[in-house]
Amino acid sequence: MLITKQALAASVALLAGSSAFADQWDNTLEQIQSQYIVPKYENFSASADELAKATAALCLAPSDTTLETAKQAFSQNIQDWQQVQWLNFGPVTYFMRYYAYEYWPDKKGVTQRQLRTLSADPSTMATPKFWTSASIAVRGMTAIESLLYHSDFDVVAKNSDCEVLEAISRHHATTTHDVLTQWQQSQATDWIFPEEGTTATPEHLVVEQLMQQWIEHMSVVKDAKLETPIGYKDQPTLKLAEFYRSEQTLPAILTNLKAYRNLYHVGQPSLFDTAMAKQPELAQALESALAENVKAALQLPNDYFTADYSQAERIEMAKPLVLSISNSQTKLSNLVTKLGFQIGFNSRDGD
Amino acid sequence: MLLSRRAFLASSLAAMSIPTWASALPIEAQGELFFSAFSKGKTDHYVGAFGSNGRLLWSMPLPDRAHAPVVHPTHSVVGAVARRPGFYIDFFNPLTGEAIKRIEPLAEHHFYGHAVFSQDGERLITQENHYPTGAGKIVIRSWPQGEVLNEYSSGGIGPHESVLMDQDVIVIANGGLRTHPDNDREIMNLETMRPNVTFLSLKDGRVINQAEPEPLLHKLSIRHLDVNRQGVVALGFQYQGELWENVPLVALVSANSDTLDYLDMPEQIRARFQQYCGSVCFDASGETLAISTPRGGFVAYWDVPSKTFLGVDNCRDVCGVIATNRKHEFVLTSGTGKQLISSPRTRQISQINQLADLHWDNHLRRINLNA
């Protein structure tokens, strides 16, 4: 078979191009893991440890002071969680860990009901296989928040409530440490299920899944964290807002939105760098949209979810943020599609 | 001279210059054609046909996204059923590209994205929602005239897909979700929904049998189904509760049982389904069951006689599944434009083709002259 010089040169250029492209995602993904996921999980694990220690100290010497220390540790742990909440991928997807971290929204008060049962006999939590079969409603931060803040529980005055709190906090810290260790000891590409015969590199497939997770999480922030509790389209359900009792709803949103910007810029080349090289207009448009998200969230008053605003007032105040998140989601979808990723067709919109 | 119904049908189709599949299928198709809706970008929607080599042989633009094709059993007619809330079924002759007919739902009704022809091809059977009341309907029209012959209750709310058990009985997946086209993704009866599978007589609309999930699982929406030659019906659920709830997602049922026989699978696989089953399909022998989950990114398989889990094929955004005429073999289509052929019992899967910039929509159908 004859191959012209031009055809050969073109083939070499094409191969070189695709190789460079693959390497680009190799580096970006490696750095997303080493400079974002692992450090954020280190923070999350460290604050979970602090929370476990604080609840142990509280139960050892119950007082308003030790309670306050435990609450502060809890708030820090929530904020660390919000940095990685967008990522329902990898170790956190096993043993229902992701859903156990937050049993939210708990529309039927399952957490409180199950906590009351545990508090009636906390010794059940010490049995060897308790945590392997325990309900996800009592395995994570939603349960801890209830014990620290819900009026049904009094961890200062009632030993059994505090015992439950201490056990859950300890379990939460262990789980988080396990997730961290698995991230430290594996590569992101270990956590995907590649198709037979696919031509896409594992790195490409992982980055694609991360982008899908990011896009989906924007919907969570806009819909579940903001629109639903304030009654943007329906009746308000403020008490079902995320971490409402500990008044962490708005800080959590703000942390999520800042995390997006962080994610966009982590590593070298970062997602932003690659996007700027290939799709500069879209890359810049997303950059502006992500900045606008943070700006719009900062416009909301600190007591936005807790003060006595009317539904109409809350909706009016939320509009710029709702529009901004929608816009950033569109920009992100457009960009990742142009970068050659599939954001899902049947998986995003079936029937 | 009195004209028999069959003769009349033949003459009607002849008058419309519709050939039979057997007389007109191109050699390139090698006796079989696959049909699916697909989209290019966000606004360009089509229905198309491809042969066993995966090459697109024909396509026609559609006004909106379609959900499942409906294929005439004898003549070269394929319909694209609009996605819920659907207001059209566009019929084409895929061998010429000619648009044959558009059928619209009854007044104040919409389609659910699926339809089926009777075994003799003389009747078109659709599932429809009378949206002012939420009543599920099975509507039987003459084909090709489109005249409404019968209108039966589906036996529930939200009749999504139906399959023929035999020439007189249809099995209906009543999903249980009441919706209205004004806000079609809002579920109006989430807390009270009661999905069921209904076996309905096509002769008189009589309910022959029904089965439904137990009350604790009332959010287990029954959406897609298939029936094998042994009369076993497989059901794929779309759970409307929380993602973390441990619920069954696949079941078998028969016409003489009112209980659902849930199929086991490893928990790590069940969790990956994300509570969502796409297509449900038996193989040619009826012994292998395939269930796709685009959200999970795989197709799962079971051995039907023993009800045991066989394994999965990982495939991003996969949804379309159809049996070939070989035992234990399926063709799969995905939102990434791929067409694959899988033999799950020998763990062999290979890509037939991939059409760039094209998203195969939910369901795949096939006409086969080789059987």
Regions of interest found by a model, annotated:
Chain B
Residues I138-S142, L190-L202, P248-A255:
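Beta-propeller blade signature
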Residues P73-T74, Q119-D120, M165-D166, N228-R229, ...:
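Residue-level detector of Asp-centered blade-edge/turn motifs that repeat once per structural unit
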Residues Q127-H130, A173-M193, G236-V247:
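Short, conserved, GDST-rich strand-edge loop motifs in beta-rich repeat architectures
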Residues L62-F91, G97-F117:
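Blade-loop segments of beta-propeller domains
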Residues M1-P26:
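N-terminal export signals
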Residues R55-M60, I100-P105, E147-Y152, I208-E214, ...:
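A short beta-strand motif characteristic of beta-propeller blades
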Residues E108-G113, Q127-M165:
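Asp-box/WD-like beta-propeller blade repeats and closely related beta-sheet repeat scaffolds
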Residues R65-V71, H110-V116, I157-V163, K219-H224, ...:
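Repeated scaffold domains used in trafficking and secretory/extracellular systems
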